[in-house]
């Protein structure tokens, strides 16, 4: 990453914004803090801002959109912008098997084995940059219904849908259909990148809204 930043500086850029996934879920934010601290000494005329979105995937994308808008408007209080954006984001996602979460250490082995055995699936959220289990439901139908229920929020909003394996795409399209009458002004459907899917496994799907 240092080489990438040096290349950007060599092109004449004097303000660099590095926007990252939650520092509580990824080490990359702290790595970039170290890199930019070193570069500040060599390039004192360049301003670096390393920003923790306190989100992942779709949520991080929504924070990034708000940051871009705020920078164009001349705002400097970007940490406050992140806070404001997070207050307007609601994320819900689930996994249909625990194997990958167990391997990554995010779920205890005994919990994961029991979940796989009796088909109990967690519904998770991102709160203050951390994963939180907000509910547990048995069976896919109940998981989908709970996610839809939680995302029915008053007001205009953007809807983001995310899935890992191709077989999960049908599920997020079902969620989209169930939310179509909820004042949705924009829909984004994205596939989870391998860097995140390696933790969740292919049977992950979710949705999130950003209140406008």
Curated annotation (Swiss-Prot):
Binding site for hexadecanoate: 26
Keywords assigned: Lipid-binding
Chain ranges of the DegV domain: 1-211
Signal peptide bounds: none
Molecular functions per Gene Ontology: lipid binding
PROSITE patterns listed in its UniProt record: DEGV (PS51482)
InterPro entries xrefs: DegV, DegV_C, DegV_domain_contain
Its job: May bind long-chain fatty acids, such as palmitate, and may play a role in lipid transport or fatty acid metabolism.
Entries under PANTHER family matching the protein: DEGV DOMAIN-CONTAINING PROTEIN DR_1986-RELATED, FATTY ACID-BINDING PROTEIN TM_1468
Protein name: DegV domain-containing protein TM_1608
Organism in which the protein naturally occurs: Thermotoga maritima (strain ATCC 43589 / DSM 3109 / JCM 10099 / NBRC 100826 / MSB8)
Biological classification of the source: Bacteria, Thermotogati, Thermotogota, Thermotogae, Thermotogales
């Amino acid at each position: 990453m240092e080489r990438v930043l040096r290349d950007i500086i060599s092109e004449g850029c004097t303000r660099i914004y590095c926007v990252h996934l939650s520092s509580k879920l990824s080490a990359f934010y702290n790595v970039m803090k170290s890199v930019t601290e070193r570069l500040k000494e060599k390039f004192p005329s360049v301003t670096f801002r390393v920003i923790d979105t306190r989100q992942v995937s779709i949520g991080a994308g929504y924070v990034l959109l708000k940051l871009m808008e705020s920078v164009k408007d001349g705002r400097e209080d970007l940490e406050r912008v992140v806070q404001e954006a997070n207050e307007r984001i609601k994320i819900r996602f689930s996994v249909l098997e625990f194997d990958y979460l167990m391997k990554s250490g995010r779920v205890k082995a005994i919990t994961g084995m029991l979940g796989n055995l009796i088909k109990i699936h967690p519904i998770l959220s991102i709160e203050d940059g951390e994963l939180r289990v907000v509910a547990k439901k048995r069976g896919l139908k109940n998981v989908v219904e709970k996610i839809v229920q939680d995302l029915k929020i008053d007001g205009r909003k953007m809807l983001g849908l995310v899935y890992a394996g191709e077989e999960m795409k049908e599920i997020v399209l079902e969620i989209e259909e169930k939310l179509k009458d909820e004042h949705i002004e924009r829909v984004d459907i994205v596939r989870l990148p391998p860097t995140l899917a390696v933790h969740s496994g292919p049977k992950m799907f979710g949705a999130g809204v950003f209140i406008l």
